Swiss-Prot record:
This is Protein translocase subunit SecA 1. The gene is secA1. InterPro entries: Helicase_ATP-bd (IPR014001), Helicase_C-like (IPR001650), P-loop_NTPase (IPR027417), SecA (IPR000185), SecA_CS (IPR020937), SecA_DEAD (IPR011115), SecA_motor_DEAD (IPR014018), SecA_preprotein_X-link_dom (IPR011130). It comes from Mycobacterium sp. (strain JLS). Residues 860-947 are annotated as: Disordered. It is found in: Cell membrane; Cytoplasm.
Length: 947
């Protein structure tokens, strides 16, 4: 029903877009008459009009006409009307559903150019580094021709290179790179260390893959937490002793394990504990679950391999060994324990955000894909994105044959090889889609036996994938590919002309970035030569039926099946597709496999005779719909839990931004001082009369905070108050606040004598930034711990999400109170010394970042220069003093670990060498780590100054 409601306005939107395209066409004649210089000058003209108040929507027809003409002159490619319609849909903040081969990459040029004119930046998001680099070079030629800067964000770039790329008018990159840069910016200790400049407009290529498939895995930056626990090994010993369906049950569909009461008793007996689920033992539940998952759900040589004593993850879809990546939440350690290899330490979360919440930061979001209709409801519900199906430039004449279902996998693959051999004999190109590297290698062996030449895409490098895919439409080409491999490159009958022309020019030593003038000069003649060769071959391919797409298994998502089919029949070309299935396929086993097997048994058909039945097709569609719904629920659940963190993250990141931008924090520091003293007094005077108050204990606590100038004995005995019973809470609080303000003013004078005027403001920034970061990390750790055990609340008939929201809020409020107390203590008690100012224009070394106080000093200097929140100081030409606060700075730089979604949506892990300065406290279990963290917090609390 929701799908139908969402599609009600589609027709009206398409008509509106058609009118836009028609209007752009009326401007084409005038634009074509312009010289190259005049066309380029249009960019400056548009910018002036925007500065004058003209709206981007009003500029759209002219800007699109200019960009279309530039693409024709630079790439010899002119946008079709449907591409102009797609570009307009993107500008209006929609998902443009454009079939494979309709030119989504070229379509993106139009809205990217228009929105870049505002000067606020445009981000074009792709699924991998190769596509980001390719599109930045390829489409960047058009933008550079029109006078715009184009940047690309790739893994491995330095911060300076990233900053330059973000300050370009249009920036290409992957979702993970954009997201991690956002998180790193909010861990930076100097304003100039940030690289992004805002979130204006993003166009997401393959939007279904990025916003849906990959949205189950949040982006996480983490650092080392502790040494590995011996509990992993202990539970790895217990797991083989436990029996499936006796001690525990396994749900393959949801990839979960559930421990029965018998299993709990078994573990309790083995460990010699009375109650596994009591608070002191609750961390052990996580070790048990991970050990059982490692045993039942993670298979060696399928999900991972063991090489040189190390557990390496294998990408199920592409078959790549994911070097340097690890499962999170203790899962990787559980597998290491199972395989008896070295167990490496867990990581502690330092910063995290979901892709859903990252992309909702943008003022305007748009996306392109060939297959979005099946997820229109989710895109609307989570991102408020409408899906607009763009008509094809030419009618699609591909023939989609019905599925063939075999009883066994062996019979299925024999039939596949026979079918491919027949097609190869007549020269028809074939693309065979598999769901895993294991099956693609098996098929490759069968083809080799039959002497069928072929290419296999178990690619380790996207560039090699693209090379093979670009030639997969040539006469007699047989290509075996996993479903996710080679996306972003068209399979063009006769070969991809642009790709082949670029390849030939690069072979001649020409490059669009390194040698742009020579590259452009040779482009047109090379392109024409390739075109003639390819068109002749394309006619031969059309004569034998076009590209034949053969799927060897249904994917759990209909969208992936449609993507595979969509490889064939582009731009009105002939084509054909068919899926070969068996009862041994993963999807069939998970849903209704037994029913179908019983049916085939009753029919008494031989193994090599397939069936074609609507009932089977319906069963498959039902199974896929169920999986899609389950995955949607997982993504919604991830978002609901992250929404709690998102509100808290906004508060912390906004506070950090204010500090980095040099805002005067004197008023905030004063408020914190008053709040902390008030909290101390409230705690001491909460119950009873004045004579019952333990003023000695209150004074002891206050002396740990600041140098108290009042003796409570004098206070009680003074004539002003009289007897102790006459002392009111308000009088006590008023006296102590005035005393604390006196002490703070004295502290400020001391620092100014030591390091000059403005020194206290500098220390406030230094301390606040340090304490916020440390408390936020501790809070993330506590929230991780809370979320890990919150599911158990369901056993008490409580909604885990509601409990998480309530307790998470309470913990956040508690963290803010602790932040105030610790900040005030440091401001009074930290030992400060003046350091000589750094020479101007000095370049900081890359390997070792300066201490926190130097960071704050730099921020203070920047603040003085900009005049924002300036402190009243005497004019002077000498450099601002630099403070060094002992006990705050810590120059340790443990390696950072980045966890984000891979192209198939599963978590992937990467490491770097630099990181934040504070590692988490050590300990064997999470509970032990918490205790260690608390002890460390206590010992690191500031003590009273002496002297």
């Amino acid at each position: 029903m929701l799908d139908k409601l969402l599609r009600l306005g589609e027709g009206r939107m398409v008509k509106r877009l058609k009118k836009v395209a028609d209007y752009v066409n009326t401007l084409s004649d005038d634009v074509e008459k312009l010289s190259d210089a005049e066309l380029r000058a249009k960019t400056d003209e548009f910018r002036k009009r925007i500065d004058g108040g003209e709206d981007l929507d009003d500029l759209l027809p002219e800007a699109f006409a200019v960009a279309r003409e530039a693409a024709w002159r630079v790439l010899s490619q002119r946008h079709f009307d449907v591409q102009v319609m797609g570009g307009a849909a993107l500008h209006f903040g929609n998902v443009a559903e454009m079939k494979t081969g309709e030119g989504k990459t070229l379509t993106c040029v139009l809205p990217a150019y228009l929105n870049a004119l505002s000067g606020k930046g445009v981000h074009v998001v792709t699924v991998n580094d190769y596509l980001a680099k390719r599109d930045a070079e390829w489409m960047g030629r058009v933008h550079r021709f029109l006078g715009l800067d184009v940047g690309v964000i790739l893994s491995g770039l330095t911060p300076d290179e990233r900053r330059a790329a973000y300050h370009a008018d249009i920036t290409y990159g992957t979702n993970n790179e954009f997201g991690f840069d956002y998180l790193r910016d909010n861990m930076a200790h100097r304003l100039e260390d940030r690289v992004q400049r805002g979130h204006n407009f993003a166009v997401v290529d393959e939007v279904d893959s990025i916003l849906i498939d990959e949205a189950r895995t949040p982006l996480i930056i983490s650092g080392p937490a502790d040494a590995a626990s011996n509990w992993y090994s202990e539970f790895a010993r217990l797991a083989p002793l436990m029996e499936k369906d006796v001690h525990y049950e396994v749900d393959l569909r949801k990839r979960t394990v559930g421990v029965h009461e018998v299993g709990v008793e078994f573990v309790e007996d083995q460990l010699g504990i009375e109650n596994l689920y009591e608070a002191a033992n609750s961390p052990l539940v996580s070790y048990l679950n991970n050990a059982l998952k490692a045993k039942e759900l993670f298979q060696r040589d399928k999900d991972y391999i063991v090489r040189n004593g190390e557990v390496l993850i294998v990408d199920e879809f592409t078959g790549r060994v994911l070097l340097g990546r690890r499962y999170n939440e203790g899962m990787h350690q559980a597998i290491e324990a199972k395989e008896h290899v070295e167990i490496k330490a867990e990581n502690q979360t330092l910063a995290t955000i979901t892709l859903q919440n990252y992309f909702r930061l943008y003022d305007k979001l748009a996306g392109m894909t060939g297959t979005a209709q099946t997820e229109a409801a989710e895109l609307h519900e989570i991102y408020k994105l409408g899906v607009v199906p763009i008509p094809t430039n030419r009618d699609m004449i591909r023939q989609d044959q019905t599925d063939l279902i075999y009883k066994t996998e062996e019979a299925k693959f024999i039939a596949v090889v026979d079918d491919v051999y027949e097609r190869y004999e007549k020269g028809q190109p074939v693309l065979i889609g598999t769901t895993s590297v294991e099956r693609s290698e098996y098929l490759s062996k069968q083809f080799t036996k039959r002497k069928i030449p072929h290419n296999v895409l178990n690619a380790k490098y996207h560039e090699q994938e693209a090379n093979i895919i670009a030639e997969a439409g040539r006469l007699g080409a047989i290509t075996v590919a996993t479903n996710m491999a080679g996306r972003g490159t068209d399979i063009v009958l006769g070969g991809n002309v642009d790709f082949l022309a670029d390849k030939r020019l690069r072979e001649q030593g020409l490059d669009p970035i390194e040698t742009p003038e020579e590259y452009e000069a040779a482009w047109e003649s090379t392109l024409n030569q390739i075109k003639a060769e390819a068109e002749e071959e394309a006619d031969d391919v059309r004569a034998v039926g076009g590209l034949y797409v053969l799927g060897t298994e249904r994917h759990e998502s209909r969208r992936i099946d449609n993507q595979l089919r969509g490889r064939s029949g582009r731009q009105g070309d002939p084509g054909e597709s068919r899926f070969y299935l068996s009862l041994g396929d993963e999807l069939m086993r998970r849903f209704n496999g037994a029913t179908l097997e019983a049916l085939l048994t009753r029919l008494n058909l031989p193994d090599d005779v397939p069936i074609e039945a609507k009932m089977v097709t319906r069963a498959i569609k039902s199974a896929q719909t169920q999986v899609e719904q389950q995955n949607f629920e997982v993504r919604k659940n991830v978002l609901k839990y992250d929404e709690v963190m998102n509100q808290q993250r906004k508060v912390i990141y906004e506070e950090r931004r204010r500090i980095l931008e040099g805002e005067d924090l004197a008023e905030q520091a004063h408020k914190m001082l008053v709040d902390v003293v008030t909290a101390y007094v409230n705690g001491a005077t909460a119950e009873g009369y004045a004579e019952d108050w333990d003023l000695e204990q209150l004074w002891t606590a206050l002396k740990q905070l600041y140098p108290v100038g009042i003796d409570y004995h004098d206070l009680v005995d003074s004539d002003a108050v009289g007897e102790a019973g006459e002392l009111t809470r308000e009088e006590l609080l008023d006296m102590l606040i005035k005393d604390a303000e006196r002490a703070y003013a004295e502290r400020e004078r001391e620092l100014e004598e030591l390091a000059g005027e403005g020194a206290m403001r500098q220390l406030e920034r230094n301390v606040l930034l340090n304490v916020i970061d440390r408390k936020w990390r501790e809070h993330l750790y506590e929230m991780d711990y809370l979320k890990e055990g919150i599911g158990l609340r369901a056993m008490a008939q409580r909604d885990p999400l509601v409990e998480y929201q309530r307790e998470g809020y309470d913990m956040f409020v508690g963290m803010l109170e602790a932040l105030k107390e610790e900040s005030v203590g440091f401001l009074f008690n930290v030992t400060v010394e003046a350091a000589p100012p750094a020479p101007s224009n000095r370049v900081a070394p890359v390997a070792a970042p300066p201490g926190l106080s130097e960071f704050a000093a730099a921020a203070a200097k920047a603040q003085e220069q900009t005049g924002q929140g300036a402190v009243a100081t005497k004019e002077r030409e000498t450099p601002a003093p630099t403070l060094r606060a002992k006990g705050i700075d810590n120059d340790d730089t443990p390696p950072l670990t980045y966890v984000g979604p891979g192209e198939d949506g599963t978590a992937e892990v990467q490491r770097s060498n630099g990181g934040p300065r504070h590692a988490a406290p050590g300990g064997a279990t999470r509970r032990e780590r918490r205790e260690a963290a608390r002890k460390q917090a206590k010992t690191s609390k500031p003590t009273r100054r002496r002297g």
